[in-house]
């Protein structure tokens, strides 16, 4: 039975290698003009950006509805005291509240996404380096050698503060 199992594993491994080698996939090069255009593409295609955009639009609509865009302005009510012919300058923030809110929301969104992408890029470089180390050590197919690799990776990630605990792989 063990002979049959090892033959099946060899056949599956050979089949996987043949499929991978026969695909001859070529990676696209120079898709983006610069790292900034790549960054914008990544940010726009994330769900967090869409959520922030919807929140910004909701906030802007709510701000305009409650400040009286469709009817009387709250400053025109009798609650403010006697009305004068002299109108006060409402100030930059009041006049351009929509633009200010949109700019602040986009700045927060882009900075948050930039932080997350920086963290992922750093984490990706560490994983690439560790993958090279795995290839150099060439673990066999038994679980004991892979448990050693996982334990080394756990301690490596914990020591470099890439993970909060020593138990990324349990």
UniProtKB/Swiss-Prot annotation:
Q: How does it sit in the membrane?
A: Multi-pass membrane protein
Which sites carry carbohydrate? 45
Instruction: Tell me the compartments it is located in.
Output: Membrane
Q: In terms of domain of life, where is this protein from?
A: Eukaryota
Q: Which UniProt keywords apply?
A: Cell wall biogenesis/degradation, Glycoprotein, Membrane, Transmembrane, Transmembrane helix
Q: Mind telling me which residue stretches traverse the membrane in this protein?
A: 51-71, 98-118
According to the UniProt record, one GO cellular component term is: membrane
One Gene Ontology biological process: cell wall organization
Query: Which family does the record claim for this protein?
Result: Belongs to the DUP/COS family.
What does this chain do? May be involved in cell wall organization and biogenesis.
Spell out the protein name for this chain: Protein ECM34
Give the species. Saccharomyces cerevisiae (strain ATCC 204508 / S288c)
Supply the gene name: ECM34
């Amino acid at each position: 039975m063990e002979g049959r199992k090892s033959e099946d594993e060899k056949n599956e491994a050979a089949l996987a290698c043949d499929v991978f080698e026969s695909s001859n996939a070529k990676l696209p090069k120079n898709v983006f003009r610069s790292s900034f255009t790549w960054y914008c593409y990544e940010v726009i295609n994330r769900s967090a950006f869409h959520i922030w955009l919807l929140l910004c639009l909701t906030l802007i609509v709510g701000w305009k509805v409650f400040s009286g865009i469709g009817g009387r302005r709250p400053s025109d009510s009798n609650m403010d005291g006697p009305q004068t012919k002299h109108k006060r300058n409402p100030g930059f923030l009041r006049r351009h509240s929509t633009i200010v809110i949109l700019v602040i929301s986009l700045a927060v969104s882009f900075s948050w996404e930039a932080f997350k992408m920086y963290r992922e890029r750093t984490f990706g470089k560490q994983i690439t380096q560790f993958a090279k180390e795995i290839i150099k050590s060439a673990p066999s197919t038994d679980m004991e050698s892979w448990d050693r690799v996982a334990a080394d990776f756990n301690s490596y990630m914990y020591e470099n503060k890439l993970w909060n605990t020593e138990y990324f792989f349990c």
